[in-house]
């Protein structure tokens, strides 16, 4: 990396300007108090922000109004005093400072600042990356679909947003681990095995002889797996299961043997399919964690013993280990309340961690898993983020309570994000696409219809906390109404500008970035300056969809700029030369730039290109060179 490139490493122009404005105003206030212009007092809390209206400067502050009570003067007088005591702004990122209205202080950024934005984006291929997170270790667990069947649209949405959140946290300066928790133990696997075993017996004896219980998995994928197993092993497992009632069958050793054999066959295939589909979906996990290892290693028993030691659990008379859910319920929300027949909620009750027969519940494994994330030998997490589906609301309270029982801080060391439902629509109607999985629309279905780019972008641009309808017809369209097309087209357009500029012999040589002085230039520059802060905010708020929304705003600004200004000079038409002098001059600047301005615009074009490419990469979406 060159010294020039190092200058723009972890460069956040917007935050740097806000910090400098705060420092200048703080210094001015201290100077005004030191010479008696303002009475000595503790500096009041004040705001430094980007104003909504560009007429109010690039940065605005309410220090004068916030200090009216402190300094016992009118805000306008305070503002004038502060400006009079400002250190010289020569050599700073500001060109002028003004007082507006009742006492707002407005600061205007210098042309050298805006030049730095362009230079930073062009010089640093990772413009937008900062050290905001200071290397704190974050574990982001997302998707974690049960390996008992295909992944559905909720998993697709969780995958798009989870992977983007992990990428945004990484770029915001956090040390991130992407993790998938494989639920390969417990009741779900027992139900999976039972479903497979019944479907296997049906292969030879028919559905009437062995009807599939309602609580079993009904999807066509179960039939396929059972059929494959039957082709390999024939009817070897059928005879030992005959001649029993349903109750006797399900309790028999023969049925247990069949279940285990089917799970041993089908589970690895399903896990491999999960990994394959997520790979096609461009998600690359750092850790695939098997729930079964928690039981095999003794981690579940160890964590239950620890909770007993901490007093968060106790042993009931029947020998079961009970978790003190009731005492945590009020503080951390619903833990295990249930609706009664009249619609009211029962009081929270303590929960079973280990049954009287010594078998732990799934919650015990969840506790052991959290403990492992926080204390594992490699990549232990300062913060464990769980991205869960809409059916997990009741999970939050018990997990937060467990976090507190370990002495951790709920909401800080453990953070749980709940995603809402997603519906696939076409022509305003719900779509059923999958033959293999019954009524489930799978990730593979979606990708096969609209492609990875459209699937990931559309699902990543929506707030995780809101229900979302995905429109297949819109995603397949090549129109500006399709958000992924709109953003990708901006990138492709910028590449076309590069090709046309090269053909015309235009390069960066001789670029005068001070000539990026039109209104359209200013709008693009302001948008570019926001990118690192957008990523930091998206990381802090755990709202990765903000990246997509920002890209759409940047693309709109760029398309507007592209339609107004030219990099490759174009002579004015005869009618355009007949306007008044001011209009003709504006058109000349826009359409027929001098070499220094054309070169500067090429740099601005390429800065936009880099930011869009970076943003799309964070979303797991490609940045095409042509469209």
Regions found by a protein language model. Name each.
Residues 2-115, 123, 129-627:
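Non-catalytic interaction-recognition regions
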């Amino acid at each position: 990396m060159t010294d020039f490139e190092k200058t723009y490493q972890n460069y956040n122009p917007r935050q740097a300007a806000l910090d400098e404005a705060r420092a200048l105003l703080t210094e001015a206030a201290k100077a005004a108090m030191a010479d008696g212009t303002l009475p000595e007092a503790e500096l009041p809390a004040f705001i430094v922000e980007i104003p909504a209206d560009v007429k109010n400067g690039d940065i605005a502050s309410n220090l004068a109004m916030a200090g009216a009570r402190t300094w016992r003067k009118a805000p306008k007088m305070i503002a004038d005093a502060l400006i009079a005591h400002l250190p010289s702004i020569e050599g700073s990122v500001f060109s002028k400072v003004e007082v507006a209205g009742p006492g707002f202080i407005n600061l205007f950024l210098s042309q050298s600042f805006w030049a730095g934005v362009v230079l930073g984006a062009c010089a640093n291929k990772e413009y937008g990356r900062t050290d905001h997170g200071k290397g704190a270790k974050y574990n982001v667990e997302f998707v974690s679909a049960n390996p008992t069947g295909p992944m559905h649209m909720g998993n697709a949405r969780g995958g798009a947003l989870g992977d983007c959140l992990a990428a945004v946290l990484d770029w915001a300066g956090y040390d991130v681990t992407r993790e998938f928790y494989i639920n390969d133990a417990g009741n779900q696997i027992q139900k999976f095995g039972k479903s497979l075993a019944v479907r296997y017996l049906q292969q030879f004896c028919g559905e009437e002889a062995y009807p599939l219980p309602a609580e079993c998995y009904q999807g066509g994928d179960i039939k396929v797996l059972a059929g494959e197993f039957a082709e390999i092993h024939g009817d070897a497992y059928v005879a030992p299961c005959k001649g029993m009632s349903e109750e006797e069958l399900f309790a028999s050793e023969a049925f247990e043997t069949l279940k285990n054999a089917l799970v041993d066959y089908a589970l690895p295939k399903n896990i491999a399919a999960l990994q394959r589909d997520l790979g096609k979906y461009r998600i690359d996990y750092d850790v695939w964690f098997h729930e079964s290892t928690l039981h095999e290693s003794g981690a579940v028993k160890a964590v239950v013993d620890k909770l007993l030691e901490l007093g968060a659990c106790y042993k009931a008379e029947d020998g079961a280990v009970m978790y003190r859910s009731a005492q945590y319920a009020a503080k951390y929300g619903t833990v295990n309340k249930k609706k009664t027949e009249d619609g009211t909620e029962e009081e929270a009750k303590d929960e079973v961690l280990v049954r009287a027969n010594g078998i732990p519940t799934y919650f015990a494994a969840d506790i052991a898993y959290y403990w492992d994330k926080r204390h594992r030998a490699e990549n232990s997490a300062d913060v464990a983020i769980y991205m869960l589906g809409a059916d997990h609301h009741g999970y939050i309270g018990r997990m937060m309570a467990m976090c507190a029982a370990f002495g951790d801080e709920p909401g800080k060391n453990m953070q749980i994000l709940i995603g809402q439902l997603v519906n696939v629509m076409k022509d305003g109607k719900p779509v059923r696409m999958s033959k293999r999985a019954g009524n489930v629309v799978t990730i593979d279905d979606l990708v096969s219809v609209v492609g990875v780019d459209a699937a990931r972008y559309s699902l990543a641009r929506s707030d995780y906390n809101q229900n979302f309808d995905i429109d297949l017809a819109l995603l397949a369209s090549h129109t500006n109404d399709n958000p992924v097309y709109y953003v990708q087209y901006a990138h492709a357009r910028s590449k076309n500008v590069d090709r046309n500029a090269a053909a015309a012999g235009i390069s960066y040589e001789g670029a005068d970035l001070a000539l990026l002085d039109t209104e359209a230039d200013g709008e693009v520059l302001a948008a570019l300056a926001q990118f690192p802060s957008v990523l930091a905010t998206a990381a802090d708020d755990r709202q990765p969809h903000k990246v997509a929304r920002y890209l759409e705003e940047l693309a709109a600004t760029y398309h507007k700029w592209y339609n107004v200004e030219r990099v490759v000079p174009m002579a004015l038409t005869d009618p355009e030369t007949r306007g008044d002098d001011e209009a003709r001059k504006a058109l000349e600047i826009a359409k027929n730039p001098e070499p220094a301005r054309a070169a500067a615009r090429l740099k601005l074009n390429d800065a936009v290109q880099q930011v869009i490419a970076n943003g799309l990469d964070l979303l797991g979406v490609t940045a095409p060179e042509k469209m």
